[in-house]
Curated annotation (Swiss-Prot):
GO cellular component terms, A-Z: chromosome, telomeric repeat region; CST complex; telomere cap complex
One GO term of the biological process aspect: telomere capping
Xref: InterPro entries: NA-bd_OB-fold, Ten1_fungal
Keywords from the named record: Chromosome, Nucleus, Telomere
UniProt-listed Gene3D superfamilies: Nucleic acid-binding proteins
Gene that this sequence comes from: ten1
Function: Required for telomere maintenance.
Protein name as catalogued: Protein ten1
Subunit structure: Interacts with stn1.
Record GO terms (molecular function): single-stranded telomeric DNA binding
Length: 102
């Protein structure tokens, strides 16, 4: 199994189509299996229909997403987890440090 690349939402457009990604985002909207996540001024649309039966989504909730980027820029979600209580500054620092090592 291929590992997911840990990124920020604003880096999704720079990733290859089909690439497996992992990122954190705040729920801006959710309707009919389509999720809009934001982080600062960046946003991404995610299709959660594959995991839909197992998903409970609340507006403004922070979510940890693993999915594949489609050609149209939407991310097909493979795994979704709540990130309630996450220390955002520490998380951002950890992602930046990890990216420097990759």
């Amino acid at each position: 199994m291929d590992s997911a690349k840990l990124i920020f939402i604003n880096q999704i457009n720079d990733c290859k189509d089909g690439q497996k990604l992992r990122f954190l985002g705040c729920v801006q909207s959710y309707k009919n299996g389509i999720l809009r996540l934001i982080d600062g001024s960046s946003s991404v649309t995610c299709d959660v229909t594959v995991v839909l039966p197992d998903v409970s989504i609340q507006k403004h909730e922070w979510l940890n997403i693993v999915g594949r980027k489609r050609q149209d820029g939407i991310v097909d979600v493979l795994l979704i987890r709540s990130a309630v209580g996450i220390n955002l500054p520490r998380y951002r620092q950890m992602v930046s440090e990890r990216q420097k090592c990759d």
